[in-house]
Every structure is written in C-alpha cells, then in structure tokens.
A protein has these predicted regions:
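Short Pro-Gly-centered beta-turn/loop motif in secreted/extracellular proteins
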Residues: 2-12, 16-19, 40, 77-95, ...
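Short beta-strand segments within Ig-like beta-sandwich modules, predominantly Fibronectin type-III
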Residues: 1, 26-28, 68-74, 102-104, ...
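Short, recurring structural edge motifs at helix starts
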Residues: 33, 48-51, 74-77, 109, ...
Length: 284
C-alpha cells in the first residue's frame, strides 16, 4: 500500500511488481480518500536452467524474459514476476543458447525447467604424439563450427589462450583450430550436453632458436624458390635472436647486417624435428 496527501485533481499512479508496471488513473476529491486498485495481470515464474534434463541446476546460466516491451533477466535458479500471455525465455551459458515460449496465466506460480544444451571442453596440446606437452600461454585454441560457410570459412564459437582452460560450448560437433607460432592444426571434436570433454592436439611441431651476433635482422624462409626465384618468408624479426615454432622440415635462415658494418648477408640451413628444440648459431 501507498499513502500520500494530494491536492484535489486527476492523477495517474504507476505501480510495479518486479519489472511488471501498470498505470492507474484516479481522482482525488476534497474531503475524501481515493483508493485506486491495480490488477497486474501477472504471474510468479521460477526458472530452473540446466545443461541437460538430468543435470544439476546451472548457476552460471542467464535467462532473459521478454514479452512486448517487458524485459527482465535472472541468473541461475531464480524467480521473476512476469505478465500474463506468451512469454519468451532466452537462456544462455557462454555461447550456448536456447529459447522457449511459455503461456502464462495471471495469478499462477510456475516453476519451469529450461534446458540449454551445453557442456565444457578443455584443450591441451603436445609437440608430437606421446611427446612433450605444450605449456606456453602463447598457444591459441579456437572452437569453430563444423560446417563451413559459402566462402569456406568457419564461425568462431569460443576461444582461449593457454592449455587446460575451460571453454563453454553448446552441444554438437565442432572443429578445434590450434595455433602456436607458425603452426596451425585443426581437429574435429564433439561436445555432449551436461558433460566435460577433453581434447589433446598433436601439433607435430618443433622449435627453431637462432642466435646471430651483430645481426640487424633474422629471417626464416622456405628452402625452395618460386618461379620468380624468391623464397617465401615464414617468420622474421629485428635483433640478434629469433625463435619460432615450426612444422618439421628443412628451412633457410637469412641473416642481414647494418649497412654501416660492411658485412655481407648470410644464409644457412636448419632442420626442425618434431618435439625437439633446434638451436642454430650463425657465427660472426
């Protein structure tokens, strides 16, 4: 209830029940008490979000409740007052989404289970099968849609840097794209609703570390030349040291020096092996 002393006249009161609001016109007359009444035409809705029908309540889930101009949202299992009629529920857990339409009757007290088919995936990587695990946070995991678009690309669903981190995912089939240095690997995987999935990516890669005292720039290029006689650049940087993650194979290392030094550029060969660190020194 609400009480106030008002001058005689016509007014509009605004009443709220949660996010449900109603406007009530009323008139105050001299010497009398106005008693406007409001009918919210609403119900009490408790949303119970789950990843699968047999899983526990998901406390991290967000549910948006909409009907026309009405909007409200709750987290985890929670209650909101909603207007009667058809109400749209949109639940989300990370990138996973689910929608349902409920028919609400005024005065009801409803508890509704909203299933948002989703799970989590934990990605790890090794440099080679049965080889050393990747520990650097420079590695990037991207979960992509299994189907390609018309232009041949895949939609990014989620992504993280570093290994062993949890990614929220909708249930379904996907492709994990993994990048470290100049290495990129794609591997299919499946997420089951209400479950935790683990994927271990074989990068088939090694590390090439180059030291070149006095160098101005170090470049790693392909050993073969194209029809124009040029070698494709793979990686490079200014300075006397350079390190890169590469697929196994033979590479050329080009070292250039400041013009003032009067030194000629150098080129040497280097071989990278899976799960190994190759250290190459370019003498002065």
């Amino acid at each position: 209830t609400f009480e106030a002393k008002l001058p005689a006249g016509r007014y509009v009161g605004v009443a709220a029940l949660g996010n449900v609001t109603r406007e009530i016109p009323f008139e105050v007359k001299d010497g009398s008490v106005a008693r406007p009444k409001v009918n919210f035409d609403a119900a009490e809705l408790t949303v119970v979000p789950k990843r699968s029908p047999d899983s526990d309540v998901e406390t991290q889930a967000k549910t948006e409740i909409t009907k026309g101009d009405f909007k409200d949202s709750v987290y985890g299992q929670n209650t909101a007052f909603v207007p009667a009629g058809e109400v749209l529920l949109t639940g989300s857990i990370g990138p996973a989404r689910a929608q349902e339409t409920l028919a609400i009757k005024a005065g009801e007290k409803i508890s509704h289970e909203l299933v948002i088919p989703s799970g989590v995936v934990v990605a790890k990587a090794v440099y080679a099968q049965d080889g050393k695990a990747v520990e650097t946070d420079d590695i990037r995991f991207e979960a992509l849609s299994a189907k390609e678009t018309l232009d041949g690309t895949r939609q990014t669903i989620n992504g993280v840097y570093g290994t062993g981190k949890i990614m929220e995912m909708p249930a379904g089939d996907f492709v994990m794209r993994t990048r470290l240095g100049k290495v990129m690997v794609e591997q299919p995987f499946t997420v089951t609703a209400g479950k935790r999935s683990e994927i271990n990516i074989d990068l088939n890669a090694g590390v090439l570390a180059i030291t070149a005292p006095g160098a101005e720039r170090i470049d790693i290029v392909e050993t073969t030349k194209d029809l124009q006689g040029t070698q494709k650049e793979i990686s490079g940087r200014y300075g006397t040291r350079h390190q890169e993650t590469l697929h196994p194979g033979d590479y050329s290392v080009k070292v250039s020096y400041d013009e003032k030094s009067g030194r000629d550029p150098k080129e040497i060969k280097a071989t990278v092996k899976a799960a190994e660190r190759t250290e190459t020194n370019v003498p002065e």
